[in-house]
Amino acid sequence: MYAIVKTGGKQYKVAEGDLVKVEKIEGEPGSSVALSPVLLVDGASITSGDDLSSVAVNAEIVEHTKGPKIRNMHYRNKTGYKRRHGHRQPLTVVKITGIK
């Protein structure tokens, strides 16, 4: 059984027991969170739309981490202007504990 959930502006296909890296979620490692909204659930039959109001995807926060380093370079011609900028996106690793 799998579900498609939306969190952090992105959609993830998850099944029970999966480890998923999502955009940062507030909470301590070991705490439980509910991922919503649920967009689709597949079991014996596919459920979508208004039938999903009773469906919940529960997850446990495993750790907070950072994504890969993204480097950006700004350059302006003939002026000697150069600037390098870096960014690492904060991520949260969650383990899917149940789809009900």
Swiss-Prot record:
> Listed GO molecular functions?
rRNA binding; structural constituent of ribosome
Q: Recite the UniProt keywords alphabetically.
A: Ribonucleoprotein, Ribosomal protein, RNA-binding, rRNA-binding
User: How is this protein annotated for GO cellular component?
Assistant: cytoplasm; ribonucleoprotein complex; ribosome
Supply one GO BP term. translation
Pfam assignment, any one: Ribosomal_L21p
Intrachain S-S bonds: none
Q: What does this protein do?
A: This protein binds to 23S rRNA in the presence of protein L20.
Of which family is this protein a member? Belongs to the bacterial ribosomal protein bL21 family.
Q: How does it assemble?
A: Part of the 50S ribosomal subunit. Contacts protein L20.
PANTHER family associated with the record: 50S RIBOSOMAL PROTEIN L21, LARGE RIBOSOMAL SUBUNIT PROTEIN BL21M
HAMAP family assigned: Ribosomal_bL21
Q: What is this protein called?
A: Large ribosomal subunit protein bL21
User: Organism source for this protein?
Assistant: Corynebacterium kroppenstedtii (strain DSM 44385 / JCM 11950 / CIP 105744 / CCUG 35717)
